[in-house]
């Protein structure tokens, strides 16, 4: 009988291993400490959904916006699981999904849901990996790289001979922007906070790097451009570089505000746009730009082929286990990172 009991217990443990998974639960909107690891059932996909067995997960500023409650939570799931990107193999496929199948290796971006061993996501947010790229490079670059692609090609068509200013040039998006913008033939000016970050931005292809802890970035931009200013400003910092970002733009230039690492801009007066030279402002988000399957496939190919052949180097700041997600968020929000953080499983 003892052997039978032991065997049954082992079977239970084995079944539990198949049926249960580790996820990160958000218990309440607010600080990073509101996240904790829990065990839950492996989900089943509904119509139009897939479940991906993650190999690795990426960390993005977007995760902090959903976690803090800045962005409304997009689903009604019982457990709130943050996380915006991952790479892995499809574990199961929901009804109506025809362009992906079980076993396919995919990368994906999603508003929430990635901080799990088995991520339940909308199939439209995944793309099959057809280029041979290292898994950690994939999760350190997918959301950031697709963001870089739409900002440089679609939100504004950056062309050879133009001048672009990029805030947070040493961050994950910033380092990809420097390299890709240089490839296009534009003059790339980056702002950073601190000498170490300045070094990282220079390595990432920026022609000019301004440390805004040390110098007035608007005055520096005027000097670099001989008072001609920039065609476009790519701003993921917001509050602390406002309204200086607009002062760096040529008449009819575009201010592309795609994040707010230093806090939101409140009480923005649209009349400022006319006062500063008939400027344009946009607040884009990646999911609008990958809603079209062909555009999503093309942007992914443009990104991964550049990583595979070395045109784009992916900066990885650190690799941390899923259980250290609180620490990872605090690093990111403390603006202590140079490149992406990879969450390992």
Give names to the regions the model predicted.
Residues 105, 163, 187, 253-254, ...:
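Short glycine-centered segments of the SAM/dcSAM-binding site in methyltransferase folds
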Residues 1-15:
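Single conserved hydrophobic/aromatic residue that forms the stacking wall/gate
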Residues 192-195, 240-311, 344-345:
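Glycine-rich phosphate-binding loop and adjacent beta-alpha segment
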Residues 138, 142-214:
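Mid-domain Rossmann-like dinucleotide-binding core that forms the NAD(H)/NADP(H) cofactor-binding site
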Residues 92, 105-168:
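NAD(P)H dinucleotide-binding glycine-rich loop of Rossmann-like/cofactor-binding domains
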Residues 41-58, 70-113:
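Glycine-rich beta-strand-centered segment in the early N-terminal region that forms part
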Residues 18-20, 279, 311-319, 326-345:
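C-terminal capping/lid region of NAD(P)-dependent oxidoreductase domains
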